[in-house]
Amino acid sequence: MTDKVQTTLLFLAVGEFSVGILGNAFIGLVNCMDWIKKRKIASIDLILTSLAISRICLLCVILLDCFILVLYPDVYATGKEMRIIDFFWILTNHLSIWFATCLSIYYFFKIANFFHPLFLWMKWRIDRVISWILLGCMVLSVFISLPATENLNADFRFCVKAKRKTNLTWSCRVNKTQHASIKLLLNLATLLPFCVCLMSFFLLILSLRRHIRRMQLSATGCRDPSTEAHVRALKAVISFLLLFIAYYLSFLIATSSYFMPETELAVIFGESIALIYPSSHSFILILGNNKLRHASLKVIWKVMSILKGRKFQQHKQI
């Protein structure tokens, strides 16, 4: 029964992976083609492309971990291979979260309407420094990933199922509590960008409230371009917050799996939930971006035209 559930969850993970790769690759491809065409890239496109690339890598690492856990559990007993996987998981995990936070910050500075001198100064400079902010996020993620990977592998990453002729069911090299504590600290490290994103969300709400009040006083209505921009930004930010909470809880499940009898099943279940975040959020970003939305509609229209043309040819041959 356990093997059937694991296989089902693995197929689910493959489906989520395919959807996520499709959405994120589309974002990266459209922005890169536009970059080549115009020979320059807008700040928002740079953030979205960086976010898409980091999520493609994150999806690959999570799916690879699922396959190893189900098909080759003994690989967890080797330090070198798992050290590489651990490093790239921590790196891509932090990169994707920090890049999404950068997107929320960018929306806040470009759309919100405040008149504080510090806000106006940062609003004016955000396009100039966004590339440096993204580079700083990369350096910070590497700085976190290297020592964290060493600590995880020094204590051994996981309690692996020992497939031996002895009566041993589980072979563990580390104290489970100590290892779970390290994993928990890694998860807590992602709360900082989450709090920054949450702050941007509330400030955007405050800015929208003030803007609507000004529109009502001037009797110009509430559905102007600035209001629409606020609403689109809020949708993107709140979707990230909700999906991140589910993503965070999924890794809490994976961490607590060290104390469960069916450790492998709990980890795969947690990782199948974790795949929802990088997979589905890309489509929310596509719908919220005019260029990406129009490009996706063109692709859908072309695909439908090709399918209709094939059906017409088949009907004509009959």
UniProtKB/Swiss-Prot annotation:
What other facts are recorded?
Several bitter taste receptors are expressed in a single taste receptor cell.
Keywords of this entry: G-protein coupled receptor, Glycoprotein, Membrane, Receptor, Sensory transduction, Taste, Transducer, Transmembrane, Transmembrane helix
* SUPFAM superfamilies assigned to the protein according to its UniProt record, in alphabetical order: Family A G protein-coupled receptor-like
Pfam families in UniProt: TAS2R
Predominantly, its location class is: membrane
Q: Which GO terms describe its molecular function?
A: bitter taste receptor activity; G protein-coupled receptor activity
Name of the gene encoding the protein in the UniProt record? TAS2R7
Q: Where in the cell is it found?
A: Membrane
Q: Where are the transmembrane segments?
A: 10-30, 56-76, 95-115, 129-149, 188-208, 236-256, 267-287
Stated membrane topology is: Multi-pass membrane protein
What name does UniProt use for this protein? Taste receptor type 2 member 7
**Known glycosylation sites:** N167, N175
Q: Which residues lie on this side of the membrane: Cytoplasmic?
A: 31-55, 116-128, 209-235, 288-318
Q: Which GO terms describe its cellular component?
A: plasma membrane
